[in-house]
Amino acid sequence: MTAPHETMSFQAEVKQLLHLMIHSLYSNKEIFLRELVSNASDATDKLRFEAIANPSLLENDADLAIRIEADAKARTLTITDNGIGMSRDEAIHNLGTIARSGTKEFFQQLSGDQQKDAALIGQFGVGFYSAFIVADKVTVETRRAGLGAEDAVRWESTGDGEFTIDAIARNERGTTITLHLREGEDDFLSAWRLKGIIQKYSDHISLPIRMPKEVWDAESSTYQRTAEWESVNQASALWTRAKSDITDEQYTAFYQHIAHDNEAPLAWTHNRVEGRSEYTQLLYIPARAPFDLWDRNHKAGLKLYVKRVFIMDDADQLLPGYLRWVKGVVDSADLPLNVSRELLQESRDVKAIREGCTKRVLSMLETLADSEEEAERAKYTTFWQQFGQALKEGIGEDQANLERVAKLLRFASTHNDTAEQNVALAAYVGRMKEGQDKIYYVTADTWSAAKNSPHLEVFRKKGIEVLLLTDRVDEWMLSFLREFDGKELVSVARGDLDLGKLADEAEKAEQEKAEADWKDVVDRAKTVLDGKAKDVRVTLRLTASASCLVSDEGDMSGYLQRLLKQAGQKAPDAQPILELNPEHALVQKLRDLPEGDAFSDRVQVLFDQALLAEGGMLDDPAAYVQRVNKLLA
């Protein structure tokens, strides 16, 4: 037996969202109608889907529609759908809480800047709560399909932190939302204004949106409402129409509907595919990454329809994980209506759709990246800033398209004195020096650390460009991207670095002489660093720094070891190699020191400085400070 009346509190995040939304989204308040119509549309989609297995849920009322009615005297606006409806528990859960992963992290991103917060909140998806932008009280009456009339509920709130829920009787299946408008919001009581908003945002909704029909009364010179209802939208699925019949504004409105995003997309592609598998795809590239893109519970995937019947919201099997940010719709003519997620994983048709959608998305990105128009290339720059790290995952996830994905990658490099990732691998290859047969890169935690790495000194001396890689995904990506255009990708921090034709015979002879001259010092340094360094040697790769650490061939880099440890994973305990610059005063001083504390301290300082320069952490910072103080005294 359900309680007839209860007063309950909103989840803390809902209170915060209501406050921020009312203040941040007020300038674009008409979106409340778009959000409520979208919810009503989703409710009818869910009913259609559940009715496939249980036709009795339709309750002899298969004419699915949304009704919108304004009452000027009562100053109310009512949105009604005959979709799936809600039970008492569903109403409490859906209307009183935000059931999304990453919600707390989202609120931590809010800055207090009204314009920035408005974009974030719009991206988060305000949904039902947008009603409070224009209403000071909202009443929801709902009954879930399949439950009795006595199981209906009324949910009501003024948005002040609490809501009431009551048991009521309701014969009609579905949901009615009544907005009691705030003072000054009479604009939304105008049928003309409401129709304009619907046609702007919701014309593409695939079921009719109906309003009371009005006719011109010559005697009063006003429009008079009749008892008849009329559709005020086209009521046909946008993706089923011919591309030539759809405007850019309509494509944008549809994107905003399915993505719950206030911004326009960067690009879209709309195609009907025939052949082994027959389907229609409408895919969008968003302009902004969702706040929970990196949350493991992030709901990704396309809306899946079968013969225009909604099946599921987040069919993640239709695109690979690295394209999880793509929004859109796929309507298949071949899949069964009762398709399950398990069946999607095994279906040959789904595999064909996945391959087709992947190729279309990559083609869109290639078109933007290679465009002769600066505005289109600027869109790719925006895309890369938002989704570049996700796209890098494709190097490891999508071997079939590895070459295409590699051409889309962008990096910072020593060619430009900026942290902006705007260098393509093809552009790097085009600038390679005569005799250069490798693509060189350095990895670090930050752009500054990469730019100032001691490993770059010999490359600057020779005028060789080096890619500066600072994303956490880079080291993992490089384990799959071994070459590009026949050129091997090589870390400048490799101990066996071979500059090939870029190193002349005189340099090689000088290196051999230095190794012989410094053998005694190097052997003593090895003894000092036993257990910390795999080897010690002199190098000519340094021009300004006294020392650097490099990795032996086949060993994991120190940077990757640190990343794995930060992620709580085990990393091989590979010791680095210490390389010393024989021309540096700090190193030359070693020759004058006998074995003992002074020699040992200087060697330890040179090792620790090299570790710090590559972003590493000292095991004993206090001991390092004491040694440096001795040297300075």
Swiss-Prot record:
Q: Which GO terms describe its molecular function?
A: ATP binding; ATP hydrolysis activity; ATP-dependent protein folding chaperone; unfolded protein binding
Q: Does the keyword Cytoplasm apply?
A: yes
Disulfide bonding pattern of the chain: none
Which keywords does UniProt give here?
Answer: ATP-binding, Chaperone, Cytoplasm, Nucleotide-binding, Stress response
Q: Which SMART domains match?
A: HATPase_c (SM00387)
Which residues does the annotated region (A) include? Answer: 1-341
Q: Which GO cellular component terms, listed alphabetically, does the Swiss-Prot or TrEMBL entry include? A: cytoplasm
CDD domains the UniProt entry points to: HATPase_Hsp90-like
Among Pfam families, the record links this protein to: HATPase_c_3, HSP90
What InterPro entries would the database entry show?
A: HATPase_C_sf, Heat_shock_protein_90_CS, HSP90_C, Hsp90_fam, Hsp90_N, Ribosomal_Su5_D2-typ_SF
Region annotated C, chain positions: 563-633
Query: Which family does the similarity line name?
Result: Belongs to the heat shock protein 90 family.
What NCBIfam families does its record include? PRK05218.1
The record's HAMAP family line, in alphabetical order, gives: HSP90 (MF_00505)
What role does it play? Molecular chaperone. Has ATPase activity.
Q: What is the protein name for this chain? A: Chaperone protein HtpG
Upper classification of the source organism reads: Bacteria, Pseudomonadati, Pseudomonadota, Betaproteobacteria, Burkholderiales
- From the UniProt record, report the name of the gene that encodes this protein: htpG
